[in-house]
Amino acid sequence: MTDTQRLDRLPDCASVQTRGRLVQTEHGWRLRNLHITCDLAFSGGDRPAARDHLALVEVGGAREGAVLQVSTWRVITRAGSGPTRLSAGRTTELGRAIEARAAFNRRARNFFEARDFIEVETPAWVRAPGTDVHLAPVGATVHLDGAHHPRPGYLHTSPEFSMKRLLCEGAERIYQLARVWRDGEVTARHNPEFSLLEWYRAWEPLDAIIDDVEQLVCQTLHAESARPVTAPIRRVTMQEVVWEACGFDILENLNADALRETVRRLELLPPHLCETPHWDDLFFALVVEHLDPHIATMGAVFVTDWPAPLAVLARKNPDDPRTAERFELYVDGVELANGFGELTDAQEQRERFEEDARAREARGLPALPMPEAFLEALRFGMPPSSGVALGVDRLLMLQLGTDTIRDVAPFALWRDEAGELVDWP
């Protein structure tokens, strides 16, 4: 048997020679590695002792059902300590998560190659990460000209600006599997570093991107996955979601005073949450209290046509400029993808960034550099385009049936039983 074969794929009585970690359980001994977890049955007097717990071993024998009947075994090296931090705090096998991610990366690359996309790479260290009030970038200063000449910068929150610059240079269908960083809380669904699959179609409408997302997600969340999703995926507008969850028309309440009055009249939020002067803060409070719980009951759903103030990088809907060409895909309340019909007007984009900057100042948030290189590219000219970012970690969580990102991202931060943050790698 080669080391990459699976025990459960072998016929009974097949000869087995493999390696792994020896684990003592209340029921006996077990062998574990990234590919195999199986019970061991030792015959004769040559059996492991307590000191062999967690040792790396080589074993040989024959399979009988789910048990490996051991005829020979030897210790390669004994463990000098207990389970590592990498092993702690998870509920699924590490190997299962690693293999699922590798399989998804292969699936994604095959998916896009079949559709004439080109895989690209863009810098993770950037001068201007974007101005979004609700995203906190991770600072990263480098010293390109020596210790006395620091160059402040950031780890990108998304490869969006760089990929759009490639669209301005003539790229038409591009995708990227990117590691990105966003400062903020550590939760079951959030980690400061995570994986995004982002792609763009020049000269094509947003519906083409929505179709891509539907096909790729349904291929990944197939019938054998923990949470299958089948096409067609339902589509509803954000206006409809707010009507169903809150009982009012969000598009008639696009300024802070009007929305605050409506929220108070309908008693949708506690009084202290209504004190904010910012429309988007009121809206996101409604998201937490009402919209997210409602969306969680809808299964797999595309929420489209978001209010224009919530889409700084998206173009407005020509049929109703109160809304933007933006969608999000949710599965059982888990936000998976966020897509735009991309704004290409450089002056309008600058004005939106400047509005963001004023909003950051009003909230006491740090000022961020204006993305001048991106704006310069827009002035050069960007074709009408559509794009999306899909959260790979969350998609894998749904595929494997886990509620925590740590089960699919081995190095994700996590909190112990006392609520203390475990040190990062």
Model-predicted segments: where are they?
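Active-site pocket scaffolds in enzymes
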Residues: 346-425
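Short, glycine-/Ser/Thr-/acidic-enriched flexible segments
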Residues: 23, 160-162, 180-182, 201-204, ...
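Generic beta-strand/beta-sheet core signal
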Residues: 32, 120-123, 303-306, 330-332, ...
